[in-house]
UniProtKB/Swiss-Prot annotation:
Oligomeric form and interacting partners: Heterohexamer, formed by a dimer of trimers. The hexameric TusBCD complex contains 2 copies each of TusB, TusC and TusD. The TusBCD complex interacts with TusE.
GO biological process: tRNA processing
GO cellular component, one term: cytoplasm
Protein encoded by which gene: tusC
Function: Part of a sulfur-relay system required for 2-thiolation of 5-methylaminomethyl-2-thiouridine (mnm(5)s(2)U) at tRNA wobble positions.
Entries under InterPro entries matching the protein: DsrEFH-like (IPR027396), Sulphur_relay_DsrE/F-like (IPR003787), Sulphur_relay_TusC (IPR037450), Sulphur_relay_TusC/DsrF (IPR017462)
Family, as annotated: Belongs to the DsrF/TusC family.
Pfam families the record matches: DsrE
Annotated protein name in UniProt: Protein TusC
Subcellular locations according to the entry: Cytoplasm
Length: 119
C-alpha cells in the first residue's frame, strides 16, 4: 500500500495553501490508508491554538486539523528546529498531539513515503 506524506511549510493565513492542504488530506484519505502529516518551517505556525485570523478578514480553518483523527490520520510530526527558530517549543499547547523530531530523524521518516505533497 502506498504511503503519502503531507508537508505543511507555509504560515497559516494570508495565502490559502494551508486550507487547500487540509482539504487535499481529507480527499485523499478516502483512497490511501497510510497518511502522515509533517509541519516544517513556517508550517509549525499552523499548530498554534487560539489564532484570530478574523482580524485580517481570514477564515480560521486551523481548527479543522482536530478532525484528522476521525480520518484515522494519527502520524503527525513537527520539526524541532523549526519550532525553536520561531520561539516555540514542544511544551507549547498545540491544536494537535504531535511528535517533535529533530531535522535528521524527520528526513529519515520522510524517506519512507511513496509520495510527498507540500503545502
Amino acid at each position: 500500500m502506498k504511503m503519502v506524506a503531507f508537508v505543511f511549510s507555509h504560515a497559516p493565513h494570508g495565502i490559502s495553501l494551508g486550507r487547500e492542504g487540509l482539504d487535499a488530506i481529507f480527499s485523499i484519505s478516502l483512497i490511501f490508508k497510510k497518511i502522515s502529516v509533517f509541519f516544517i518551517g513556517d508550517g509549525v505556525l499552523q499548530l498554534i491554538k487560539n489564532q484570530q485570523p478574523e482580524h485580517i478578514l481570514a477564515r480560521n480553518y486551523t481548527s479543522s486539523f482536530s478532525i484528522l483523527s476521525l480520518y484515522n490520520i494519527k502520524d503527525l510530526y513537527c520539526c524541532k528546529a523549526s519550532l525553536l527558530e520561531r520561539g516555540l517549543n514542544n511544551n507549547n499547547n498545540f491544536i494537535l498531539n504531535i511528535d517533535v523530531l529533530d531535522s535528521y530523524n524527520l528526513r529519515l521518516k520522510l524517506d519512507n513515503y511513496d509520495a510527498i505533497i507540500n503545502f
